[in-house]
């Protein structure tokens, strides 16, 4: 019997825990069951109390104190410890039925999704046939305010694509906190970010305004040392790097974003629908036969 899950990922501040809370609330309102797992060993406050919390196994504070690691190293240590104690996950999940949506709230340290093989190993363990057999979807959140800074947006998008390639499971990319960009970005302009391409850099109004203000030509003076420029991150080399990153993302043609506003119930419902489609949740549910109360009453009479 298959189980179903969504692993919620993204950089720090993307609104992962807030989205998990909104999703659980929506599921409860629609009489669907959720099993909430917190895998962030540094998280302390939750709107919905986790059904399973990694801090019951190991906390980031304990890892840092006992092993003498920093925050990022401590986080990696916590996940390595988790991978050595996977029975802790199995015992909690193996009794769940296919009616549950397992929601896994992940930490925001990006190296987990890009640099180390721990998460791919964890996803493989959860999804392999056997006692768990979880049909997993990866849900990657990127804060919508990133669209204001296009270099930052493409950097975040590159991380999302890296996670897609690493995990090799159905993947949904989300622009979260849409309520924060209302009035800042026109709907027509925002639509272009849903399928990123190099053209976004060509039409960057911030870069265009800067060039007019500084009276620059198409390229900066590369003879200047980086420390002689007002800002190192706005030179010709930086622009070429951004263009290379954007070109790489466009060449893969893998990234499409969906919009999320957790304050809007319809928006949360739409994201849940995408998740259900990815993991084929409804196809696995037993068909429910209609109950004809009148016929039942006649039969009983």
From Swiss-Prot:
For this protein, the record's SUPFAM superfamilies field holds: P-loop containing nucleoside triphosphate hydrolases
InterPro entries reported in the protein's UniProt record: Gpn, Gpn3, P-loop_NTPase
- Source domain of life: Eukaryota
Molecular function terms in GO for this entry? GTP binding; GTPase activity
- Which residues does the UniProt site feature Stabilizes the phosphate intermediate point to? 72
**Motif Gly-Pro-Asn (GPN)-loop mapped to chain:** 70-72
The record's region (Disordered) falls at 212-232
Which regions are flagged for Basic and acidic residues bias?
223-232
Q: Which UniProt keywords apply?
A: GTP-binding, Hydrolase, Nucleotide-binding
Q: Which CDD domains match?
A: GPN3
Ligand binding (GTP): 13-18, 176-179
How the protein assembles, per its UniProt entry?
Answer: Heterodimers with GPN1 or GPN2. Binds to RNA polymerase II (RNAPII).
For this chain, the family text in UniProt reads: Belongs to the GPN-loop GTPase family.
Quote the function comment for this protein: Small GTPase required for proper nuclear import of RNA polymerase II and III (RNAPII and RNAPIII). May act at an RNAP assembly step prior to nuclear import.
By what name is this protein known?
Answer: GPN-loop GTPase 3
